[in-house]
């Protein structure tokens, strides 16, 4: 391997490690915030305070809090010297981690947090301005900025690569295995294995309708041409030939549905394998997506949220869900049940809307409250 390849590999490894540390610390900070909001009335967690929950539950809460706080401290210590390599979104995440660490102070303050502390000599905002000027005049700032650009470039390349793998690998595995492996195997063993030749009432019903339509077409053609209708023997022969053809088509559709099931299973297994083998890259992809989403303006975020909710849980969403369910049923050769479709439409969009509103309340309201305010304004204050 050449020297440049080794440098690129080392840079990519550093980028993945830095993104992983930031993501773990950010998730831990969000966990502490959620514990504060849910159990301590959005106040600081105090181990000596007795909650109105069983002791085992409170012990679990404190254990999760201590673990998350330890992760925040570790991440803050690792990332403090690499602040110049972070972009604006990652800097906001780091600031949240540092605010959690500073709120709970040193390790000794976890068990007995201080009630008061001496005020700062200068406001923190003014100290931040001085620190920003110092960083701009520091000779090593240029190297830090270049390193940050390289890390963001590596993050983008890793995210695009793993995204392509997640999309292309399952599709290619499904198509190739279905064409060259599953299809010949099903054709070979379908006459011998009963479960590959299951009853096909829906396909048989479609074939019967086509046969009746074919009989009516023969009679209609005879009337149009002004000839005598076919006698019973000729009509029976033509209907027998057509019935044989329709039966063959129904068998082919049945086998095609079975092939689709096995091909989709192969694609699902390939997707799971890619996820297991690319766990570090998936964390980088998650950070890349967060940066892209939260980098949007408040109006763009609100527009995307309204568009998503109107498509999947809006007024016209039942028609879309009906088409989707019919397509899935046809893909797997299943009968389309209108009762099941109505039940699904009556329950699933409601559950999806509830989950989405809960996400807005618990997560987006903390990360981007201005987006929530814009969303309420675009929804007419609702």
UniProtKB/Swiss-Prot annotation:
One of its GO terms (molecular function) is proton transmembrane transporter activity. Belongs to the CemA family. This is Proton extrusion protein PxcA. It is found in: Cell inner membrane. It holds the Pfam family CemA. Required for H(+) efflux immediately after light irradiation to form a rapid H(+) concentration gradient across the thylakoid membranes. Together with PxcL, contributes to transient H(+) uptake following dark to light transition. It comes from the Bacteria. It comes from Synechococcus sp. (strain CC9605). InterPro entries: CemA (IPR004282). Keywords: Cell inner membrane, Cell membrane, Hydrogen ion transport, Ion transport, Membrane, Transmembrane, Transmembrane helix, Transport. The lineage of its organism: Bacteria, Bacillati, Cyanobacteriota, Cyanophyceae, Synechococcales. It is a multi-pass membrane protein. GO terms for cellular component: plasma membrane. The chain crosses the membrane at residues 162-182, 257-277, 305-325, 340-360. Disulfide bonds: none annotated.
């Amino acid at each position: 391997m050449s020297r440049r390849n080794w440098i690129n590999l080392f840079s990519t490894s550093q980028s993945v490690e830095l993104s992983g540390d930031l993501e773990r610390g950010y998730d831990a900070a969000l966990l502490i915030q959620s514990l504060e909001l849910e159990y301590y009335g959005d106040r600081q967690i105090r181990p000596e305070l007795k909650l109105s929950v069983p002791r085992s539950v409170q012990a679990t809460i404190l254990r999760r809090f201590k673990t998350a706080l330890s992760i925040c401290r570790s991440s803050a210590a690792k990332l403090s010297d690499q602040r110049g390599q972070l972009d604006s979104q990652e800097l906001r995440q780091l600031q949240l981690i540092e605010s959690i660490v500073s709120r709970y102070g040193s390790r000794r303050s976890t068990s007995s947090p201080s009630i008061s502390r001496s005020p700062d000599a200068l406001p923190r905002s003014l100290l931040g301005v001085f620190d920003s000027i110092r960083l701009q005049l520091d000779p090593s700032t240029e190297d830090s900025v270049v390193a940050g650009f390289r890390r963001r470039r590596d993050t983008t390349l890793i995210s695009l690569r793993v995204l392509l793998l997640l999309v292309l690998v399952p599709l290619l595995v499904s198509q190739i295995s279905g064409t060259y492996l599953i299809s010949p195997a099903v054709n070979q063993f379908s006459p011998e294995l009963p479960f590959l030749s299951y009853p096909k009432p829906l396909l048989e019903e479609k074939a019967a309708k086509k046969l009746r339509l074919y009989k009516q077409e023969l009679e209609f053609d005879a009337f149009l041409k002004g000839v005598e209708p076919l006698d019973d023997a000729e009509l029976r022969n033509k209907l027998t030939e057509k019935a044989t053809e329709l039966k063959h088509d129904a068998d082919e559709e049945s086998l095609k549905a079975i092939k689709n099931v096995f091909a989709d299973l192969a694609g699902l297994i390939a997707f799971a394998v890619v996820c297991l083998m690319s766990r570090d890259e998936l964390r980088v992809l998650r950070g890349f997506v967060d940066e892209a989403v939260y980098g949007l303006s408040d109006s763009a975020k609100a527009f995307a949220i309204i568009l998503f909710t109107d498509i999947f849980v809006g007024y016209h969403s039942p028609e879309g869900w009906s088409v989707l369910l019919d397509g899935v049923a046809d893909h797997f050769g299943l009968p389309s049940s209108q009762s099941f479709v109505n039940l699904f439409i009556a329950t699933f969009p409601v559950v999806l809307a509830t989950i989405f509103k809960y996400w807005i309340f618990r997560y987006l309201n903390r990360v981007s409250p201005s987006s929530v305010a814009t969303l309420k304004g675009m929804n007419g204050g609702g």
